[in-house]
Structure formats: structure tokens, C-alpha cells
């Protein structure tokens, strides 16, 4: 059931390409393990999440990888001009809210023999409308239920395109669950997304994900409708101009918008702490304050936040 919900959300042609794991780091390690050459030539944006940055830094340190990091604006051109084995990019950058719109350009470069393209959809899944139907046969997509899917921890997933990475070196016994009758010594793999499965894990997150999706379906709430509602709250907050000393990194344009507003300023950490003392929950990444609005808030909540900010 969870596979079907995810496939419908992303417009994937086949739910069986989806595998589950407690975290996306597992999938990064398994994908990397399936690349036969060393060092692996990796291209990524300079705004990737901590788990990717830490693991990649360690692989570079160990001589396992050569990393090229560029800004999101330079990613597509660099990918087209260079020779890489792995291209990794967030759909929505966690620290700035910028949205990468060149997914089709990156996908056009992907081949089973390399390069492979991995899209980190953690801030995109159920946060912005995402249609992978045209590129599903070429790209990996990783995400999870911890953010906008409202399913909590421990329910992450990977869409693995057919014919790419058929035999990850890092593997668990679930990856051969359909082939347990193989003779001793044979290492079999599922032919679908199950080839990226690990071993025994707590499946309760899948039940939470299913429950959330059923509830949203019953209420007629799609990602598009929720995003439109949140965008009204975001614009209401922006119009109030209650953070004049901060720069908004992700102003509204003509396309999709992240579910959070990213404000950059030297006092971001101090303001985060000050708001927390007033029971206003935001988060901070270095000098960037992220303010997220959701379905459970309304214009009155925005006005209260504006009042608190103006009174500081």
C-alpha cells in the first residue's frame, strides 16, 4: 500500500521500483557500493544535507571518491561538461529553499553504465508537486516521511530505475527475499526496487504513512492544494516585512515554492533562541532562519508571529 501511495504522489509508472529503509543514508551507501570503479567521481551541489556531506567527506578522505561541489545554478552545466560517475542533487535545498528545475537535463545524462543521477527529495516529497513520470526510467529518487508526509521517523524510500545498479555490494537479506531458495554461495537480488532493501527494520512508519495518505485522500487534500494554502500564509508573512534586517533567500517566483521561508542574517541563531523562549518553533542552519507554515496554521497565527517579531 505504501508503495502505491508514493508512486501515485510522484507519478511513477511502477510501484515495485520503490524500496524502504529507516533512513536515506542507507540508500546512499548502497548506491555508492554498486559503482564498480574507484575513486568515484561525484558531482553535487554545495547545499546538500549533513548526512550526504559527512559521508562524502569521509569517502574523499579515504580515497574512495573525488567530489566536485558547485552552486545549484552551475549544476546542470557542470554535469554536461564533466565526466562523473554519480550526480547527486536535492530537489529542494534544505538550507535555502531553492528548487532545482533542471532535473530533466540531469536525467538526460544518466545511463546504466554511468553516470547515475540521484535526486534527494526530502524537502520536495509532498512539499512541492513532483512528477517523475518522464524521467523515472533514468533517475534514483530518495525521500522520506519525516517532513511533509507527516509520517514521522523511520520511513524512508528509494525509487530505483530498472537496469541501474542491479547488484549493490552493501546488501541485506531482504534484497533476496524472493530468491531465498538459491543454492548456498549464490548471491541473488530482487529484480525490482527490492534489490536495495536491507535487513529487518521497524515497519510502523509505513502504517503511519498509509494512515496519513488515507486521511488526506478522504479530505480531498492534494499536495497542490496544501501548497497553495501554505503559500498564502507565506505571502502574508512576507508582506508584513517583520524581518527587515534579514535577506529572504527564496522569494516567490512563477514556479513551485518550498514549504519554508529561508531568512539569512547574522542574528539568525539568536533570533531562533528568542522565538523558542516565546514558544515559537523555527529552526536555524548556520546564519539562516527557516520559518515553516503548515495546514494546521491560519492567518491569525501569522499575525501573532509578526507581532512577536515586531516587539523584540
Roles of regions detected by a PLM:
Residues 68, 72-126:
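Active-site phosphate-binding strand-loop segment of PLP-dependent enzymes
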Residues 113, 269, 273-312:
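PLP-dependent enzyme catalytic core of the Aspartate aminotransferase-like
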Residues 40, 64, 110-116, 138-139:
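A short helix->loop->beta-strand "cap" motif at the edges of active sites that frequently abuts
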Residues 22-25, 30, 44-63, 73-75:
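Substrate-binding/gating loop at the entrance of the active-site cleft, primarily
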Residues 227-278:
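Conserved PLP-binding catalytic core of the aspartate aminotransferase-like
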Residues 190-238:
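Structural signature of PLP-dependent enzymes
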Residues 1-39, 50:
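Conserved beta-loop-alpha segment that forms the PLP phosphate-binding cup at the N-terminus of a helix
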Residues 135-185:
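Active-site PLP attachment segment
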